[in-house]
């Protein structure tokens, strides 16, 4: 969620020097190593997890009751000769699909066609996918050979940020890079291909992955499959929505502060943030903060993906004795409010674990979250100069306000005044907190918390107060101390929803989000298991314990009506709405603690600065939504959108409380993203134009790490940024 890093620990830019390196050869060498990557299954650690995937492989039906759209842009149905239905596909895990392909009961090409058809039909509502590569994916599926790949022929969606695939869009969320494509394929992506996945497209994310929601100005808002009135999370929001909606069984993501686990919690999917340095192709972010991995619908698939991408051969098998106490807390590490629903989710998990014979001990949260996050934001702001670097390379001039969203601009201006000494001090303090956490794990091997403090917030809530947006527009007029305080203050509203995820990244520890809870409004909520470095398998065993005992609780998404043309709105018929009043559940105990610390947050008037450009919330102008196709959900009044259960939801009490102070006046007109949802899917000529480097041209390259992951602009000359003295 909220931080960007560079390959250097300090990244305030004053000048550059170019260092020529054989980048392409290095990447090639790394990629060649992935071909020998095999699935490592430790017997002791995998027995419980294997049990969760031991059910019979989905039976191949001879019925074709689900009409599958052709992958071609004409939208015709797949031939009736196909015996594998869309329903079969949506119910199957990635491992089951690979087994079917291996046993020749279905072809990878058929699976890809189904995945493309679902995506093109349902994406106009969710805006989870930003590009499709139909022709390439079908060609790769047809040519696929079985060499023992664990995910043979399984369709996969790739996160659009930080995971380069040669020839595909590589914008980092910047409008001025809308035509840029990757000049090479990253090691992580190559490893996914070597594992047998067929990449069918790329998923939505916020600009540079800064946020815990995906509300990109360029691509629009990625919304939640369980209720499109709510966010899908960030920064891997498109990935979470794609998996929850069964576009694909697994989508790749990246996590530098919760960017896998936050969407997992809010979309009812499984999200693992692996330990520092154990996954192939991990970024070179400072202290290994960013990791690349994926989201899935089952712990079994997550475990198989982990073992496939694992590079550390001596990782412990993982074992949690019932004699070892498990710690739990529902306290926010920063003292911010936590919803009653999140507390209930943890309480249910505690009761289940006690029934299984484990000892549970309630503790105070061992981390000083306010102190940790101030260090976190120092590191983030110190690396925002990457936006200026890219603007200079592409536009041949310094970065200007209109080039980027408001948050990127504010971080860039703040970063100019952050010295290398400040960044070093921040990391030193983080290391001290990590040491204290390591000592905690000596007594309690597991810490159980909510993954997020509440269910997904409403898309009417930009998670930015209007007075903060106004101050950010003039941030260059503030002192360095005032700038840093503003960065902390403006992020506090968003951080209040997700205070539990950042420590795992900064400390290098693994963390697993498992979807065990569904609110009365039908929105998912995850619980999070945290442990010490390299104890990933222990976490996966705990997740498997919940899965094997049917404690994975995911909302049900109704199948579309096959007898009529799909409605891109995703709304049920209004006359069937049992409760369109929008009133909150009267029986639900309100949580009035959703307000941030009033001593730290200026009073939110709710009125925008009329003279200021709206913030970079990524939300479309409501007055234009029904007139254009530029909003996240076309032709829809987003204040009147019932959920899929047929009722208007009020969201969590925490959501209501924060909405009351933050959702007025900060609607952004910046969210006129470049591609309408309808034109984006199924009409390749309207996707970003692919501009490849000329043969023999030396293309500048940089390897910067953001909250959402690492991005490699292209291979060529690497520019190393000097830090301010």
Curated annotation (Swiss-Prot):
It catalyses: N(6)-[(R)-lipoyl]-L-lysyl-[lipoyl-carrier protein] + H2O = L-lysyl-[lipoyl-carrier protein] + (R)-lipoate. GO terms for molecular function: hydrolase activity. The chain crosses the membrane at residues 700-720. Residues 556-637 have a biased composition (Basic and acidic residues). Coiled coil: none annotated. The keyword Cell membrane applies. Lipoamidase activity is slightly inhibited by p-chloromercuribenzoate. Changing residue 259 to A: Loss of activity on the lipoyl domain substrate and on lipoylated small molecules substrates. Its EC number is 3.5.1.138. GO terms for cellular component: plasma membrane. It comes from the Bacteria. Residues 1-52, 551-686 are annotated as: Disordered. Optimum pH is 7.8. Pfam families: Amidase. It is found in: Cell membrane. It is a single-pass membrane protein. Residues 28-40, 662-679 have a biased composition (Polar residues). Homodimer in solution. Amidohydrolase that releases lipoic acid from the protein-bound form. Cleaves the amide bond that links lipoic acid to the lipoylated lysine epsilon-amino groups, leading to the formation of free lipoic acid plus the unmodified protein. Shows activity toward both high molecular weight protein substrates such as a lipoyl domain and intact 2-oxoacid dehydrogenases as well as small molecule substrates such as lipoyl-lysine. Also acts on small biotinylated substrates. Hydrolyzes the synthetic substrates methyl lipoate and lipoamide. Expression of Lpa in E.coli is toxic as it inhibits aerobic growth of E.coli through inactivation of the host 2-oxoacid dehydrogenases. This is Lipoamidase. It comes from Enterococcus faecalis.
């Amino acid at each position: 969620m909220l931080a960007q890093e560079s390959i250097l620990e300090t990244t305030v830019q004053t000048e550059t020097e170019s260092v020529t390196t054989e980048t392409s050869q290095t990447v090639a060498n790394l990629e060649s190593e992935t071909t020998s990557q095999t699935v490592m299954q430790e017997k002791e650690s995998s027995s419980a997890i294997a049990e969760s995937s031991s059910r019979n492989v989905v039976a191949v039906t001879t019925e074709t009751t689900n009409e599958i759209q052709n992958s071609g842009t004409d939208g015709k149905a797949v031939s009736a000769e196909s015996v594998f239905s869309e329903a079969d596909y949506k119910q199957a895990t990635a491992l089951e699909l690979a087994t079917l392909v291996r046993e020749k009961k279905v072809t990878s090409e058929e699976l890809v066609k189904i995945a493309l058809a679902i995506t093109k039909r349902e994406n106009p509502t969710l805006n989870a996918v930003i590009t499709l590569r139909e022709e390439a994916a079908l060609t790769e599926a047809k040519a696929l050979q079985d060499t023992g790949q664990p995910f043979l022929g399984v369709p996969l969606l790739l996160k659009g940020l930080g995971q380069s695939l040669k020839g595909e869009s590589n914008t980092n969320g910047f409008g001025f890079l809308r035509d840029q494509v990757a000049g090479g394929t990253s090691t992580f992506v190559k490893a996914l291909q070597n594992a047998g996945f067929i990449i069918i497209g790329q998923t939505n994310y916020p600009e540079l992955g800064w946020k815990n929601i995906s509300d990109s100005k360029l691509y629009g808002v990625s919304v939640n499959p369980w209720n499109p009135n709510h966010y899908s999370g960030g920064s891997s929001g498109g990935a979470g929505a794609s998996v929850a909606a069964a576009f694909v069984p697994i989508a790749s993501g990246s996590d530098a502060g919760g960017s896998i686990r936050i969407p997992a919690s809010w979309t009812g999917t499984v999200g693992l943030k692996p330990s520092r340095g154990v996954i192939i192709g991990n970024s070179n972010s400072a202290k290994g903060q960013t990791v690349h991995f994926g989201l899935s619908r089952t712990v079994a698939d997550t475990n198989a993906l982990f073992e496939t991408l694992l590079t550390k051969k001596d990782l412990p098998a993982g074992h949690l004795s019932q004699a070892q106490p498990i710690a739990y807390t529902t306290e926010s590490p920063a003292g911010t409010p936590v919803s009653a629903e999140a507390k209930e989710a943890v309480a249910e998990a505690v009761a289940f674990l006690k029934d299984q014979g484990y000892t549970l001990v309630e503790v105070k949260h061992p981390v000083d979250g306010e102190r940790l996050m101030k260090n976190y934001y120092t590191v983030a702001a110190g690396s925002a100069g990457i936006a200026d670097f890219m603007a200079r390379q592409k536009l041949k001039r310094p970065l200007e306000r209109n080039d980027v969203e408001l948050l990127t601009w504010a971080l860039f201006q703040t970063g100019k005044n952050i010295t290398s000494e400040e960044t070093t001090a921040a990391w030193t303090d983080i290391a001290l907190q990590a040491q204290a956490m390591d000592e905690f794990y000596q007594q309690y091997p597991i810490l159980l918390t909510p993954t997020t403090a509440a269910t997904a917030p409403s898309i009417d809530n930009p998670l930015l107060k209007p007075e903060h947006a106004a101050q950010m527009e003039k941030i260059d007029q503030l002192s360095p101390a005032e700038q840093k305080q503003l960065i902390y203050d403006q992020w506090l509203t968003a951080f209040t929803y997700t205070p539990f995820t950042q420590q795992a990244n900064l400390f290098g520890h693994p963390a697993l989000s498992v979807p065990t809870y569904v609110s009365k409004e039908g929105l998912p909520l995850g619980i999070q298991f945290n442990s010490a470095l390299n104890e990933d398998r222990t976490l996966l065993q705990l997740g498997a314990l919940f899965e094997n005992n049917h404690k994975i609780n995911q909302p049900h998404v109704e199948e579309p009506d096959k007898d009529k043309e799909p409605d891109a709105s995703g709304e049920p018929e209004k006359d069937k709405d049992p409760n369109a009043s929008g009133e909150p559940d009267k029986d639900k105990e309100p949580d009035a603690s959703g307000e941030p610390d009033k001593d730290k947050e200026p009073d939110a008037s709710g009125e925008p600065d009329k003279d200021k450009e709206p913030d970079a919330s990524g939300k479309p102008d409501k007055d234009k939504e029904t007139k254009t196709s530029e909003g996240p959900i076309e032709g829809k009044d987003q204040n009147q959108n019932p959920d899929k259960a047929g009722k208007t939801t009020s969201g969590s009490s925490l959501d209501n409380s924060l909405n009351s102070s933050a959702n007025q006046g900060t609607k952004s007109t910046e969210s006129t993203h470049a591609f309408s949802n309808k034109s984006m899917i199924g009409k390749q000529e309207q996707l970003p134009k692919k501009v490849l480097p000329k043969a023999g041209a030396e293309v500048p390259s940089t390897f910067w790490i953001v909250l959402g992951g690492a991005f490699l602009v292209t291979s060529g000359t690497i520019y190393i940024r000097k830090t301010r003295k």
